[in-house]
């Protein structure tokens, strides 16, 4: 590892790492969430993730995305300021690294994603792209089929989940673990859907797919408590 990293925890074979600036409490919280999400994963998916060298990097409050050595190359992207855009990125087979941020892990008031758990979202991408897809070549076809059906049904209109199959999956995982944000009317990012129970009613096909990989737990280590003020229309 790059000498930037000074702290380390082992989440069932997934290293959780950070610089000296990352408080121990944030590293431990990331470890808890990763361990929690992996509990129900099939053994072959876990083995694929561990064997690929997937890891989770925690950014300190005053570190940016490009302070992470593996993401420093994003400084040269003139189309986007990644230090403003992202407080967490998912991993894939080209770069098996998930990142997240201290302020979201510990629910600081200044967290710009205060209503949702970003590590759950970003680690969901890694589970998909590092753990499942490489050993299940037909998985994306399954997702594409589910995605096409919800489009035909007019669901997820004006939400981030409708970006592509990757965000459809990751937003679904957030809903599964009851750590997504909700709004009364779709705002381009979210809608009224933010819990597993609502997901089962609103999108039972995605719910059934997720149930093959995740446990239907009721309590989460996330500090982002479930707030369910709105319910999505079922049709």
Whereabouts are the PLM-identified features?
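Acidic/His-rich structured neighborhood in mature extracellular/periplasmic domains
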Residues: 1-4, 11-146
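Extracellular/periplasmic catalytic domains that process cell-envelope and extracellular macromolecules
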Residues: 8-10, 48-52, 161-169
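Active-site rim elements
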Residues: 18-21, 155-163, 193-199
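Short, conserved helix/loop micro-motifs enriched in His/Cys and acidic residues
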Residues: 101-106, 146-155, 188-190
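Post-HExxH zinc-binding segment in Zn-dependent metallohydrolases
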Residues: 130-182
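Pan-zinc metallopeptidase signature
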Residues: 173-235
């Amino acid at each position: 590892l790059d000498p930037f990293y000074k702290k380390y925890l082992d989440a069932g074979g997934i290293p959780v790492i950070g610089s000296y600036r990352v408080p121990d409490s944030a590293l431990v919280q990331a470890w808890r969430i990763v361990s929690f999400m992996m509990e129900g994963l099939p053994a072959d998916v876990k083995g694929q993730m561990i064997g690929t060298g997937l890891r989770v990097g925690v950014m300190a409050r005053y570190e940016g995305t490009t302070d992470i050595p593996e993401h420093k190359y994003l400084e040269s992207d003139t189309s986007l300021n990644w230090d403003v855009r992202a407080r967490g990125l998912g991993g894939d087979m080209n770069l098996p690294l998930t990142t997240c941020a201290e302020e979201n892990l510990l629910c600081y008031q200044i967290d710009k994603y205060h209503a949702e758990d970003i590590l759950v979202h970003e680690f969901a991408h890694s589970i998909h792209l590092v753990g499942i897809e490489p050993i299940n070549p037909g998985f994306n076809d399954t997702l594409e089929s589910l995605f096409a059906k919800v489009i035909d049904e007019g669901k997820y209109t004006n939400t981030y989940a409708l970006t592509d199959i990757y965000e459809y999956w990751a937003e679904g995982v957030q809903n599964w673990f009851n750590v997504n944000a909700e709004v009364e009317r779709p705002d381009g990012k979210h809608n009224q859907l933010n819990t597993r129970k609502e997901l089962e009613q609103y999108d039972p096909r995605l719910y059934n797919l997720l149930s093959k990989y995740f446990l239907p737990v009721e309590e989460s280590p996330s500090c982002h408590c479930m707030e369910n003020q709105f319910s999505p229309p079922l049709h």
